[in-house]
């Protein structure tokens, strides 16, 4: 099974080798026919501490690295 890849924006880089990435998805409500935006935060591994708040990044699924980290940053 291929690993999922998501696009998002770094919202926090306070922890060592970890960034928090906010990923937004858009969908049409089935009844209201209105476009709705929802966002979800993922904690991702950043080995070189290269990414700062506001950077656009791509994250990919990986094996669990800690209790909450299951993603790694692959590009910006």
From Swiss-Prot:
SUPFAM superfamilies according to UniProt: Nucleic acid-binding proteins (SSF50249)
Keyword hit for Transcription regulation: no
One cellular-component annotation, GO: cytosolic small ribosomal subunit
Source superkingdom: Bacteria
UniProtKB keywords: Ribonucleoprotein, Ribosomal protein, RNA-binding, rRNA-binding
Keyword Ribonucleoprotein: yes
GO molecular function: rRNA binding; structural constituent of ribosome
Pfam entry (one): Ribosomal_S17
Gene Ontology biological-process entries: translation
Family listed: Belongs to the universal ribosomal protein uS17 family.
Known role: One of the primary rRNA binding proteins, it binds specifically to the 5'-end of 16S ribosomal RNA.
Subunit structure, interactors included: Part of the 30S ribosomal subunit.
PANTHER family named in the record: 40S RIBOSOMAL PROTEIN S11 FAMILY MEMBER (PTHR10744), SMALL RIBOSOMAL SUBUNIT PROTEIN US17M (PTHR10744:SF1)
Protein name as it appears in the record: Small ribosomal subunit protein uS17
UniProt organism field: Dinoroseobacter shibae (strain DSM 16493 / NCIMB 14021 / DFL 12)
Upper lineage: Bacteria, Pseudomonadati, Pseudomonadota, Alphaproteobacteria, Rhodobacterales
Gene behind this protein: rpsQ
